[in-house]
Every structure is written in structure tokens, then in C-alpha cells.
Design a protein with these regions (language model features):
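Walker B catalytic acidic pair
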Residues: 119-121, 242
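ATPase catalytic-site recognition across NTP-hydrolyzing enzymes
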Residues: 181-247
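Pre-P-loop entry segment of helicase/translocase ATPase cores
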Residues: 1-22
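Residues immediately C-terminal
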Residues: 62, 123-124, 245
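ASCE P-loop NTPase helicase motor core
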Residues: 123-196
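A short beta-strand-to-loop transition that corresponds to the Sensor-1 phosphate-sensing loop
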Residues: 29, 59, 101-103, 147-152, ...
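Conserved P-loop
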Residues: 20-88, 157
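Inter-Walker segment of RecA-like/P-loop motor cores
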Residues: 60-114, 202, 209
Length: 252
């Protein structure tokens, strides 16, 4: 059988080599999540003896836009057929890689899976995993990879924190910023930083779960006083945005 020459940078390799059944990767933009997922989809499909694999994005069109070209490029030596309309790849061992959209949940039902990638899980309803995809892994103890950039403290965050606790040996979390991709010039990331709010930058490039999309102010717009300097006589005002606090956010 043709041997695939897997090429990954150091941080991608950490995830690729980890043996845990369920891996969660929260990473900044352009880290290389899609390429990592593509290699794992190909390898897992080639190793499967009975079941196929899924790549699931928030929509079918996103799945095709993100993954179709990458898979065909990396897997050209092991792909026997490619069906453009349905976005299904058949490999030389007969196993198939299906590209799916979570917005069409009925197309995800009725199959058993050897391996599964869920991309941008923060943008996918949690019941798609809990009620449809998780049961599909049960009969052959299939594996899953979750990848995405955080979108506040939602179900992606909760699943990440569950893995982070370390109480379930089947789960492992990984956190990377865009700086962890050695193929992206640091100067390019710094250039993007100058035109973004500090909160947006933290979310998109540093993969911060705390950077909610409603936060629009850049940190360097705020001038802090000397904490050791006593205030002068006069009238002072304070404004508090309670929506910015985690406890209030959870109760809202």
C-alpha cells in the first residue's frame, strides 16, 4: 500500500501523536487545524477495517470549502475516487471519507463511524454531538477530534474544560495560539493586531475563551492611572458594565 508522508509542524504533531480517544483543540486562526484534521482523516480511514469516517463542519458548504481541496491534495496517492457533488472520497482500501454539514443533521444519522472530526464546534448545536454523532462511535469505539477557535464560554468551552480536568482518561485538551504555527510570520500576526480590538485579537489569534464578540474596545485606548498616587480632590465617576463579568453572563 502507498505510504503517506505526513508533514506537520511541532504543535500539530503533539495532537497527531496523542493516543487519547477524544481530543479537543482550541487554536487561533491559521494554526493549521484543517491540515491536521485532513491528515488524521486519511490515516484513520486507511487504518479502518469496517467503518468509514466523517468530517463535520457547521454547514455542508463550509465542509466542502475548508476540507475538500486539502484532502484531495494530501491524499492524492491513496484516493481511488472522488465524488464532487456529494463530497465523498473513496480510498484504496475501500473506506470512505464523508464531508458533512451539521445544519443537515438527518444526513448524519444511521451510520457507525471509525473516526470523526468536528470543526468549529462552537458554531454547531451541542445536540448534534450528544444525540447523533457520539452514538455513531459506540459500536467500534470510534474516536473523535474537535477543532475550532473559541466563541466565548459556550458548549465548546464546557467540553474543553471537561477534558482539562483530567478525570476522564479518554479525553485530552490542547490549546494553541496562531503564534504556534512556525509557517506564519510573527510580523503578519502583529500587523493584524493593530487593526483589531484587543478582545477580538485574543479570541481569533490567541484562542481565548474570555474574548466575547461583544467587546469592541482596544486595551491601548484605556489610560490607567498610577495606583500608588492618591486621587486629588474633586468629583469622580465610575461606570461598570456588568455584562462583561462571567458570573453575570451565566445568569443573564
Amino acid at each position: 500500500m502507498t505510504q503517506l508522508q505526513v508533514k506537520l509542524h511541532e504543535k500539530q504533531r503533539e495532537v497527531f501523536d496523542d493516543p487519547r480517544r477524544f481530543r479537543i483543540v482550541a487554536a487561533g486562526r491559521r494554526f493549521g487545524k484543517s491540515r491536521l484534521a485532513a491528515w488524521l482523516l486519511l490515516i484513520e480511514a486507511l487504518q479502518s477495517t469496517s467503518k468509514d469516517v466523517f468530517y463535520v463542519a457547521p454547514t455542508f458548504q463550509q465542509a466542502k470549502d475548508i476540507m475538500w481541496g486539502v484532502l484531495k491534495d494530501l491524499g492524492k496517492d491513496v484516493i481511488s475516487s472522488a465524488h464532487e457533488n456529494t463530497s465523498v472520497l473513496t480510498l484504496v482500501n475501500g473506506r470512505k471519507i464523508y464531508l458533512k454539514g451539521a445544519d443537515r443533521p438527518d444526513t448524519l444519522r444511521g451510520v457507525g463511524l471509525h473516526f470523526l472530526v468536528i470543526d468549529e464546534y462552537a458554531d454547531i448545536k451541542p445536540n448534534v454531538w450528544e444525540q447523533i454523532l457520539r452514538p455513531a462511535l459506540a459500536d467500534v469505539q470510534g474516536k473523535a477530534l474537535f477543532i475550532g477557535t473559541p466563541k466565548g464560554r459556550n458548549h465548546f468551552y464546557e467540553l474543553y474544560k471537561y477534558a482539562e480536568k483530567g478525570t476522564d482518561e479518554d479525553w485530552k485538551e490542547f490549546h494553541y495560539s496562531s503564534y504556534d504555527n512556525p509557517l506564519i510570520p510573527e510580523s503578519e500576526i502583529e500587523a493584524a493586531k493593530t487593526s483589531m480590538s484587543s478582545f477580538a485579537f485574543r479570541q481569533e489569534f490567541l484562542a481565548s475563551f474570555q474574548a466575547a464578540s461583544r467587546d469592541i474596545f482596544k486595551e491601548d485606548w484605556i489610560e490607567y492611572g498610577d495606583e500608588d498616587e492618591e486621587p486629588k480632590d474633586g468629583r469622580y465617576y465610575i461606570a461598570v458594565d456588568l455584562a462583561g463579568f462571567v458570573a453575570v453572563d451565566k445568569e443573564a
